[in-house]
């Protein structure tokens, strides 16, 4: 670093980050000291952001996939002019602060997504880059490029070791996400020690084999070399990885070792760091020249870029008024839907086929709906419209995710984070295990991502226990802010899908059946929106309540009718969404599940655990499934009417 002001800025980021971590007595100084020059170069020479209009639509997106480097992100965002004060920096990792331990979306200005679980940032960045590429192709006309921005990622060795990163890198290369630029903080150290103890890949050959552009910067403090590499990446027609060799904990006594990764430096080491860097400022003191430099090279440059874009958008409005109006509709999700186009299924059908048909109709009417399946389109019946999104065909809204469930979940999140599009992904329910961290991320970030899973019980049948979900409802229903919906027929499918598509701040999971299900007399699309409602009422004094969902609801109703023949009268409640039901007024919940009726039996072909919240008794499945034709499943597991009738009669 030859430029004195650049050197001062980089060292300011380093010391702000170190002092934040010291004050909190918690954090990760290694990446702050090693990567400060990388993030400084990106912000001051390339990143187009408007700190005065943080949601400017055509801004570049920057994802700190290595979320443990949050102190560095907060420090530079403070310098850049975001609403992050010195007091906020001093409150790093403290109760109710605006600077939490890992970056949190919508909690701190300048944070594009919640990161921390390694690999999630890279994969979601693929979704952002895909969204940019699709929308640019859809809207840009006559050199009026109203969608024209880059997605940048800063990652470390740990990110690239995650399986989700491998999936995402492969996907990005295949779909040629050329405006995705990954800055790889390659310091050869991770928490356990040297990276070569766990990893011996040839990064260059690996990325080039997956259709990425690769560059190496040998000195992570060489701002000019980093700048040149980013310039080259922006010209590339492929996604780009820039491997930047850094020294973890640069400037301090433990630099270059794993000792510096995740613990505060302390007073003595910080003093040595200041001496080594020639940095004489007091803790949390920032030279006015640094603020001035960032104001000129980040804030002012970003405002100018925004102004140019706004002028371009006005010209676009004048020349292409219809397309402009469509653009506004995309950005605001302002599309109307004609529900009369949704077919009825009076004779029943599998809910996977019904949902697939309904999703097709939504896609026909909502041009911003995009998504696909993890190599399971013929089985899930879930696909996007207008053909396949490919490197050489950007009009398609069907994303062929391949057998990459984890990346699919994060890519869906990234598309939804980007804005302008509403994304969904689908697979077999049993393989929601592979997606759980991405689904959890969606719930934390309050993203309206849509995850659709077919084959939701042991009625998968012949494929056996590896393909038959048991604990999966319990797993997903236990995630806060996740709406897990399990419809029983076309009327409930209609409600569940509409709720998911119109959700604003809650991700949705919809599970569907492999087998055909009957259409039930008293199911109701409106009532289903409450999460639970009465579908069969006892003709006389209620002895108890059966609660069920999905494919077992019809069996529960038939069981109630069988009990009635023996003068035992029960109510049947459909509960497609415990999440929605829990959010209703107490008066409504009492009307469906009166507290005076304690004899309640929940019936679902999955783990029994979640249902004890609503029922004293549960008929579930707490063993793994079996390989057999579906005709054997109900009797074997006790979900036929005769077995359920006897089960209820034996309740005390």
Where are these regions (language model features)?
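Terminal amphipathic helices with adjacent charged low-complexity linkers/tails
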Residues: 58, 240-333
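Thiamine diphosphate
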Residues: 1-150, 297-508, 516, 641, ...
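Residue-level marker for buried hydrophobic side chains located in beta-strands
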Residues: 153-154, 182, 372, 486, ...
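Conserved beta-strand elements of the Class I
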Residues: 152, 370, 545-547
């Amino acid at each position: 670093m030859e430029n004195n002001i650049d050197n001062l800025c980089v060292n300011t980021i380093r010391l702000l980050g170190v002092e934040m971590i010291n004050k909190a007595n918690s954090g990760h100084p290694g990446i702050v000291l090693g990567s400060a020059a990388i993030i400084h170069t990106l912000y001051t020479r390339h990143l187009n952001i408007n700190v005065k209009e943080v949601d400017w639509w055509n801004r570049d997106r920057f994802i700190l996939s290595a979320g443990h480097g949050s102190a560095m992100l907060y420090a530079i965002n403070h310098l850049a002019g975001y609403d992050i004060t010195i007091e906020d920096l001093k409150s790093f990792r403290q109760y109710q602060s605006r600077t939490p331990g890992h970056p949190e979306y919508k909690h701190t200005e300048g944070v594009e997504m919640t990161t921390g679980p390694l690999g999630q940032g890279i994969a979601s960045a693929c979704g952002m880059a895909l969204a940019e590429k699709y929308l640019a192709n859809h809207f840009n006309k006559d050199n009026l490029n109203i969608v024209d921005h880059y997605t940048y990622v800063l990652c470390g060795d740990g990110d690239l070791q995650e399986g989700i990163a491998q999936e995402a890198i492969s996907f990005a290369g295949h779909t040629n996400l050329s405006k995705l630029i990954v800055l790889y903080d390659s310091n050869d150290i991770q928490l356990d020690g040297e990276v070569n103890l766990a990893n011996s890949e040839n990064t260059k050959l690996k990325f080039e084999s997956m259709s990425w552009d690769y560059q190496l910067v040998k000195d992570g403090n060489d701002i000019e070399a980093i700048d040149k590499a980013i310039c080259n990446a922006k010209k590339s027609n492929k996604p780009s990885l820039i491997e930047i060799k850094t020294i973890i904990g640069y400037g301090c006594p433990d630099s270059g070792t794993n000792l510096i990764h995740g613990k505060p430096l302390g007073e003595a080491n910080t003093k040595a760091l200041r001496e080594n860097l020639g940095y004489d400022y007091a803790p949390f003191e920032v030279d006015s020249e640094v603020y001035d430099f960032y104001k000129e090279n980040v804030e002012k440059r970003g405002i100018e870029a925004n102004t140019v874009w706004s002028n371009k958008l006005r010209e676009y409005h004048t020349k292409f008024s219809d397309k402009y109006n469509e653009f506004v509709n995309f950005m605001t999700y302002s599309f109307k839907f004609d529900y009369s186009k949704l077919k009825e299924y009076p004779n029943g059908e599998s809910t996977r086929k019904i949902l697939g048909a309904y999703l097709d109709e939504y896609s026909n009417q909502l041009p911003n709906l995009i998504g696909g399946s993890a190599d399971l389109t013929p089985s899930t019946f879930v696909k996007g419209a207008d053909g396949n999104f490919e490197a050489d065909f950007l009009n398609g809204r069907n994303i062929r995710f391949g057998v990459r469930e984890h990346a699919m979940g994060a890519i869906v999140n990234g598309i939804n984070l980007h804005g302008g599009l509403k994304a969904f992904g689908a697979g077999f329910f049993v393989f929601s295990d592979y997606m759980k961290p991405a689904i959890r991320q969606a719930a934390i970030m309050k993203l309206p991502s849509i995850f659709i899973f077919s084959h939701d019980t042991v009625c998968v049948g012949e494929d056996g226990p590896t393909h038959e979900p048991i604990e999966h409802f319990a797993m997903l229903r236990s995630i806060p802010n996740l709406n897990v919906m399990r419809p029983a027929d076309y009327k409930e499918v209609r409600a569940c899908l509409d709720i998911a598509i119109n959700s604003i701040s809650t991700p949705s999971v919809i599970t569907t059946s492999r087998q055909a299900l009957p259409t039930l007399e008293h199911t109701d699309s409106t009532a289903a929106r409450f999460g639970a409602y009465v579908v069969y009422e006892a003709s006389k004094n209620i002895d108890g309540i059966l609660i069920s969902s999905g494919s077992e609801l019809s069996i529960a109703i038939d069981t109630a009718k069988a009990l009635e023949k023996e003068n035992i009268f029960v109510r049947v409640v459909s509960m497609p969404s415990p999440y929605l039901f829990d959010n209703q007024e107490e008066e409504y919940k009492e009307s469906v599940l009166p507290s005076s009726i304690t004899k309640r039996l929940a019936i679902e072909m999955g783990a029994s655990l979640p249902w004890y919240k609503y029922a004293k008794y549960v008929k579930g499945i707490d063993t793994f499934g079996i390989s057999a034709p579906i005709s054997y499943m109900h009797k074997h597991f006790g979900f036929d009417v005769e077995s359920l009738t006897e089960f209820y009669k034996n309740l005390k």
